[in-house]
Regions:
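Positively charged n-region of N-terminal signal peptides that target proteins for export
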Residues: 1-4
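Sec/Tat signal peptide C-region and signal peptidase I cleavage site
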Residues: 12-19
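Substrate-binding/active-site clefts of carbohydrate-active enzymes
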Residues: 21-29, 34-52, 56-196
């Protein structure tokens, strides 16, 4: 799963650079605009206020995951619940995020976002992902998008006790198991569609 995440992040970063017309032999410098538990230091408004200071030295600022987690104001974003419809995070709201990106862009700084696509939080039970609509398309993950060995088999045990029984994917996790949230089956065409 780690290899998949790193590969996906690298590809998305490379794709966005080409989409912005950056040269193939890009030699810019990226600043990581966050560190663990940097809720205050990495707020969108704080990063935006530093744009003039950053512009002479950095071409990109890597920002933390921006989707809503609903857990608390002290989440680094790795317990993401909403991917498309709610960008209110520990770092600020959607308007502040857009303002930061716009300011960075006006100063010649690109923005690259950390993304979490290997696991996802659910609403109230182990398998109820939120339904989201983005640009006219509705996205829904199902119990069959969860790896069969999620939570060291705990999710399967839970699923088998439900009436009616809840089905999971027949595929095992392709990375490390993490029992904090549901591990997603990246061999699932639905997961691939939602992630892409």
């Amino acid at each position: 799963m780690k290899k998949f995440f790193l590969t996906a992040a690298a590809l998305m970063g490379a794709a966005s650079m080409f989409a912005q017309g950056w040269p193939a032999n890009y030699e810019g410098v990226m600043l990581q605009g966050f560190y663990w538990d940097s809720y205050r230091a990495s707020k969108w408004q704080n990063l935006e206020a530093q744009a003039d200071d950053l512009a002479p030295y950095f071409s990109l600022v890597w920002v933390p995951q921006s989707a809503n987690c609903t857990s608390s104001e002290r989440s680094m974003g790795y317990d993401d619940l909403y991917w498309f419809s709610n960008y209110n995070s520990s770092f600020g709201n959607e308007a502040e995020l857009r303002s930061m990106i716009s300011t960075f862009k006006s100063k010649g700084i690109g923005t690259i976002a950390d993304v979490v696509i290997n696991h996802r939080k659910t609403l109230t039970s182990w398998t109820d992902f939120p339904v989201e609509t983005y640009r006219g398309l509705t996205y829904k993950m199902n119990s069959t998008d969860i790896c069969s060995d999620d939570d060291k088999g705990g999710t399967l045990t839970w699923a088998n006790k439900q009436t009616p029984k809840v089905s999971l994917s027949s595929n095992k996790d392709t990375g490390d198991d993490w029992d904090g949230m549901r591990d997603l089956d990246h061999n699932s065409s639905n997961v691939q569609n939602v992630v892409a």
